[in-house]
C-alpha cells in the first residue's frame, strides 16, 4: 500500500524528497516575489517551529512536516491584493475579510500539489484559536502541532 502523503513514509526516496523540495521552493519563490518580508517571516516561523519540534523530540517526519508548515503557513497571502497585505489591519472591513481568507486560499493551493495532504490542515487552521475567536472557521477547542 502506498502512503497518501509523502510525510507518512518513513523512508522517502530521493526522487520524492526532490519533488517535494522543488514544489516548496517554487511556492516560496512566488511568495518572495509577492513580498520579501512575507518570505522572511515564513523562514523565521519555519526555523522556530522546527527548533521547537526538535526540542520536543518529535520524529524526523514530524519535524519535516512542521518545518514545511512553517514555510508555507502564509502561502495563501500570495492571493491577497498588495494594498491589503501591506496595510493590514488598517484596511476596510471588506479587506479584512479578504485577508482572513488566506488560510483557506493556502490550503486550496496545496490541494493541487500531490503529496502535500498532511500540510493542508496545518495551513488551513493555523489562525484558529482555542476559544473560537480565530479564523477562517472559528473552530473551538482545536489543538494541533501548529499550536504546541
State the predicted function of each range.
Residues 1-147:
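Histidine- and acidic-residue-rich, metal-dependent catalytic cores
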